Swiss-Prot record:
InterPro entries: ApaH, Calcineurin-like_PHP_ApaH, Metallo-depent_PP-like. Gene3D superfamilies: 3.60.21.10. Its EC number is 3.6.1.41. This is Bis(5'-nucleosyl)-tetraphosphatase, symmetrical. Belongs to the Ap4A hydrolase family. One of its GO terms (molecular function) is phosphatase activity. Pfam families: Metallophos.
Length: 282
């Protein structure tokens, strides 16, 4: 009964299946955690969604920014870009079923027994766990409602970038979405910086990676996240697990077996190209 945490798949279906075969994943007894960004850039987004959906209760996932962008394309709000390789998914006969399932997935996973939290980009140091749970539910409720296209149309933007319990309406939902799915750097007070994508050693002062700023969640829980492929899984404090290692850019798909903290990797089938940059709202 093992728990396997895997970083951003980004449509790399063949590598996902090979990695699961490598660790001998058994859906009847094991649990798979996925850090989000299931789709886009790799050639197999349709197969990834079909497979992950088929796992039922054996999988725990969170939505990433690319998953939200896919939903915006599906809703007719955003443009389908060829580089995202989403057309086979959008034109599939079961597209409606898959994407209506996807929009009902969470932004946050918490296992109290393991003291483990997972979100696509991480947890802002401005939140305690109760606030994070409440904020996740706010966005999840809108995404699972009939008014979800209205939210998706309004989610794009970098402001507000500072948390306040007084935030309301679309401003509140946009901050929550950015914190869970786009965050990398923060100012020392926890305010989000949505612009810098430099490596941590080259980040302009006073910015710090979100995980370098102590917060209530990181002090009490381990945190698993994806999103930040250029970290290559390195440079995080103890108990913080960066799992996106750039499979869709030619890197690797990384798996962490939680029980013994052993890592497994599956090399990408693509040539290394970390210079492509990350897609919309990355």
């Amino acid at each position: 009964m093992a728990t396997y945490l895997i970083g951003d798949v980004h449509g790399c279906y063949d590598e996902l299946i090979a990695l699961l075969q490598q660790v001998e994943f058994t859906p009847d007894t094991d649990t798979l955690w996925l850090t989000g960004d299931l789709v886009a850039r790799g050639p197999g987004s349709l197969d990834v969604l079909r497979y992950v959906k088929s796992l039922g209760n054996s999988v725990r996932l969170v939505l990433g920014n690319h998953d939200l962008h896919l939903l915006a394309v599906f809703a007719g709000i955003s443009r389908n870009k060829p580089k995202d390789r989403l057309t086979p998914l959008l034109e599939a006969p079961d597209a409606d079923e898959l994407l209506n399932w996807l929009r009902r997935q969470p932004l946050l996973q918490v296992d109290e027994e393991k003291k483990l939290v997972m979100a696509h980009a991480g947890i802002t140091p401005q939140w305690d766990l109760q606030t994070a749970k409440e904020c996740a539910r706010d966005v999840e409720a809108v995404l699972s409602s009939d008014s979800y296209p209205f939210f998706l149309d309004a989610m794009y933007g970098d402001m507000p970038n500072n948390w306040s319990p007084e935030l309301s309406g679309l401003a509140r939902l946009r901050f929550i979405t950015n914190a869970f799915t786009r965050m990398r750097y923060c100012f020392p007070n926890g305010q989000l910086d949505m612009y810098s994508k430099a490596s941590p050693e080259n980040a302009p002062a006073p910015l710090k990676p979100w995980f370098a700023i102590p917060g209530p969640v990181s002090e009490a829980y381990s945190i698993a996240f994806g999103h930040w492929a250029s970290l290559e899984g390195k440079g995080t404090p103890e108990g913080i697990y960066a799992l996106d290692t750039g499979c869709c850019w030619g890197g690797e798909l990384t798996c962490l077996r939680w029980e013994d903290k052993q890592y497994f990797v599956q090399p990408s089938n693509r040539q290394m190209d970390m210079g492509e940059g990350e897609a919309v709202n990355a």
